[in-house]
Design a protein with these regions (language model features):
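Hydrophobic ligand-binding cavity/cleft-lining segments
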Residues: 1-60
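Eukaryotic N-terminal targeting leaders
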Residues: 1-3, 156-159
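Intrinsic-disorder/low-complexity, polar/charged segments enriched in Ser/Thr/Lys/Arg/Asp/Glu/Gln
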Residues: 5-9, 66, 115-117
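Short, surface-exposed coil-to-beta transition loops
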Residues: 7-9, 75-79, 98-105
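Beta-strand elements of well-folded, non-transmembrane domains
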Residues: 14-16, 73-75, 122-126
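Glycine-rich portal/gate segments that line the openings of hydrophobic small-molecule binding cavities
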Residues: 54-94
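Beta-strand/loop substructures that line and gate deep hydrophobic ligand-binding cavities in soluble
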Residues: 93-147
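Intrinsically disordered, low-complexity terminal tails and linkers in eukaryotic proteins, enriched
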Residues: 151-155
Length: 159
């Protein structure tokens, strides 16, 4: 069984200006979830060189939307599963061949007059060991991508 370990977590705050009142906050969260779904279906919008070759969408027994994606990055082809709920989006890559298992999750917190916080959480197979300088570069790339995603969402939310 693959054991995943946390490797990086950070958050980006979206200001509450467009979220006054419970109904408005709920509407913003629904729109934000739709934007994150759009990003999951079209990652090339923010990640140059990463394309979805195919996406199968369905609703699981718990009521979450699930995307089974086939992704292409250069010559590499891999699969993942994206699970979208009201307050969380999880990208899960299974272990296949040379690629170790990993997850990337975005949690939505706050709203209703409070700032909306996007918490980004990364986990990977505990056997993955990277040199410190590579780990640092990867972390910077993740953080930049997440900040770009949050800014893109804020722009489309009118925040």
């Amino acid at each position: 069984m693959t054991v995943l370990r946390p490797v990086f977590e950070h958050e980006v705050t979206l200001p509450a200006t467009a979220m006054e009142g419970e109904a408005a906050a709920a509407a913003v969260r629904v729109r934000l979830a739709a934007l994150l779904m759009q990003f999951a279906k079209h990652p090339h919008m923010l990640i140059e060189g990463l394309h979805c070759r195919s996406v199968k969408e369905y609703t699981n027994d718990a009521g979450a939307t699930v995307l089974e994606r086939e992704l292409v990055a250069g010559h590499a082809v891999f699969h993942d599963t994206v699970t979208v709920t009201e307050d969380r989006v999880v990208f899960a890559v299974p272990e296949t061949g040379d690629m170790k298992a990993s997850t990337f999750a975005i949690s939505l917190e706050g709203g209703d007059g409070k700032d909306l916080v996007l918490r980004f959480h990364y986990e990977e197979d505990e056997t993955v060991k990277l040199p410190a300088h590579i780990e640092g570069l990867r972390t910077k790339a993740w953080k930049a991508k997440d900040q770009d995603l949050a800014a893109w969402c804020a722009k489309h939310l009118g925040i």
